Amino acid sequence: MKKDYKKVFLKNTKEERIKENSNYLRGTIIDDLKDEITNGFTGDNFSLIRFHGMYQDDRDLRLERNEQKLEPRYAMMLRCRLPRGIIKAKKWLKIDHFASKNTLYGTIRLNNLQTFQFHGILKKTLKDAHKMLNKIGLDSLGTANDVNRNVLCTSNPMESLIHQQCYEWVSKISNFLLPQTKAYAEIWLNQKKIATTDQEPILGKTYLPRKFKTTVVVPPYNDVDLYANDMNFIAITKNNKIVGFNVLIGGGLSINHGNKNTWPFLAVELGYITLEKTLSVAESIVTTQRDWGNRTDRKNAKTRYTIAKVGLSVFKKEVEKRANMTFETIKPYYFISRGDRFGWTKNINNDWSLTVFIQNGRIYDNDKQLVKSGLLKIANLHTGNFRLTANQNIVISEILDKNKKKIEEIAISHGLIKKVSSLRENSMACVSFPTCPLAIAESERILSFFITKVENIMLKYGIEKEIIILRISGCPNGCGRSLLAEIGLIGKSLGRYNLYIGGNRIGSRIPKIYKENITEQEILIHLDFLIKIWSIERQKKEHFGDFVIRRNVVKKVVNPIYDFWN
């Protein structure tokens, strides 16, 4: 008798009930918006606004307002939907203006989902945010919660004809998998409700069991960290054209401390497809996960757990059945790096791109750099695009020859072109405190200082020009992608972290825990020792992560289901 995996799980979670009863993500959000007494969204709406691209929290003001016996002052984070990470420079002017005038922090945050987000929007100005985005052709629908999130793309589609084709496929996939509900337009843009029944032919009435992430990648660069994502399309080319995709599925990095039923996992190969099958295969992968994914335990609801439960071959056969096709054998591909290439690049149409490093992706001005002001000046002059990268940096692209010198002068004078170490350029941190509701340890706010201390260690041993992929996450939810780093810190409690080592340079190996629940000072002592022996004993051009595996400092993670925790 054939097993029906859709019926394996019986009792659904609270989140499933919320989606079921939400009337296609409407809930009573409109009522909460009309309520001028409370600052936030209540009940089910607290969860539902995430489908509209927002998170709510008050943690940076909670203690102070509790002591003053005041009602919580909630503020929202809003994340834009920006498939492929591209935005016209002129549209940036509106984004900058909104951040300056309508957020508590006055900053813009680039994230590693290749888009930007605002922090500190009060409820009374939320509609203004959505209307502003709508005026420049953007929205925030589906950038959070149980849907296909922002689709990532290799960063610079202007670099070659292949990159331009990649760019077009990202748009097709993103639009194809977007929620069809009219709730977003009705609530945030005051669009009149039409007396028809909503339908979600791909996502379904209760949407997906958990968040779902997709990438489109042009080898040999893995800047999007494809192995961390649910569904990935690796471009295969012939005669300067994309002819098909290798399809990989089931990647993900979130864990729960101490819960051995959770584990990170690298995306695995399904097979090769020709271009005309792309959308039907994408739909079939998503709907298989929709129907078979775990809706009773959100900690085991991601695609990788579905594959582990039913087996890759069974999952693959179901996708082939739904798409009415058969996967071909994987085509050869390889990766050489995943970092951004900073500085000037000449594009195929003879204009220019300038990639600039943005520490932590945080766009603001301070006494050392005028990043926000500099980008604003460039946006006023520039006729091309800003392209956001999955490493939280910006590519100023399609720069005309006549503007190149002026843009370079602005970039230099505002600190956008500035020599920093390779270690710093390849570092990353999630937002964490004070605005992330899941944070349990510092991340973004300490990264720069921590990198300086590691830079000093590397200088001491004469290897200050070397690259180490170092990342910090304020909780084990995976946003900082620390579990694909050569050195990864994951917050365990305030001021304490688990230290993981042994990932590789291209992001295709999960690191192993080296020390648990230790302070920053203890971490630096351990790193001093490890970097010292690496500098002395490494083989020619041997990377740090490869060295600690070869030296048996930690065991290589081969199958994280069995050996990540052991």
Curated annotation (Swiss-Prot):
GO molecular-function terms, A-Z: 4 iron, 4 sulfur cluster binding; heme binding; metal ion binding; NADP binding; sulfite reductase (ferredoxin) activity; sulfite reductase (NADPH) activity
Catalysed reactions, semicolon-separated: hydrogen sulfide + 3 NADP(+) + 3 H2O = sulfite + 3 NADPH + 4 H(+)
Gene Ontology annotations for the cellular component aspect, listed alphabetically: sulfite reductase complex (NADPH)
Cofactor note: Binds 1 siroheme per subunit.
Gene3D superfamilies found in the cross-reference section: Sulfite Reductase Hemoprotein, domain 1 (3.30.413.10)
Assembly and interaction partners: Alpha(8)-beta(8). The alpha component is a flavoprotein, the beta component is a hemoprotein.
Protein name as annotated: Putative sulfite reductase [NADPH] hemoprotein beta-component
Naturally occurring in which organism (per UniProt): Buchnera aphidicola subsp. Schizaphis graminum (strain Sg)
